[in-house]
Amino acid sequence: MKKNRLLFRVIILLILCGAVGFTLYQGFFADKEKMQIGKEAPNFVVTDLEGKKIELKDLKGKGVFLNFWGTWCKPCEKEMPYMNELYPKYKEKGVEIIALDADETEIAVKNFVKQYDLKFPVAIDKGTKIIGTYSVGPLPTSFLIDKDGKVVEKIIGEQTKEQLEGYLQKITP
């Protein structure tokens, strides 16, 4: 009876060690697609609220301002009008602004877009897979991607209009 108990405990211990080892492996080594400053931005494909497919690799040759946000996020709400105001000017210069919502309902996101009359592409990161790939923590978080598809900078937190314009100038081709 004691041998069975000991064997059972050893088996449970091995299973736990295996689970911990697998978790550590996944966290540190498995995902080579993670975003790194100075490296090529991980590709993604989303469909915006207008039904248009957006694939990051198709935007090579343009600067990309990639913004992760949420409708509930007050700092996100404050910077959206600045992005909307600057979008036409920088779109003409070869810069795209893409806003990826953090997995909220389509109704909530559409209502927000309508309320602020947003003109730039807005999509929902369903399942937050892209957020994970880009190692996004607090919202808003934005990434500057140059014309060659490389990540130039990661910006965490709300931006003023002046800061945003400076970032857009930085990635203008």
UniProtKB/Swiss-Prot annotation:
GO biological process: cytochrome complex assembly
Coiled coil: none
Disulfide bridge partners, by residue number: 73-76
Subcellular location field: Cell membrane
Domain called Thioredoxin: residue spans: 35-173
GO terms for MF: antioxidant activity; disulfide oxidoreductase activity
UniProtKB keywords: Cell membrane, Cytochrome c-type biogenesis, Disulfide bond, Membrane, Oxidoreductase, Redox-active center, Signal-anchor, Transmembrane, Transmembrane helix
GO cellular component, one term: plasma membrane
Membrane topology: Single-pass type II membrane protein
InterPro entries assigned: AhpC/TSA, Thiol-dS_OxRdtase_ResA, Thioredoxin-like_sf, Thioredoxin_domain, Thioredoxin_ResA/DsbE_sf
Pathway: Protein modification; cytochrome c assembly
Residue spans crossing the bilayer: 10-29
Recorded family membership: Belongs to the thioredoxin family. ResA subfamily.
Protein name, as recorded: Thiol-disulfide oxidoreductase ResA
Native source organism of the sequence: Bacillus cereus (strain ZK / E33L)
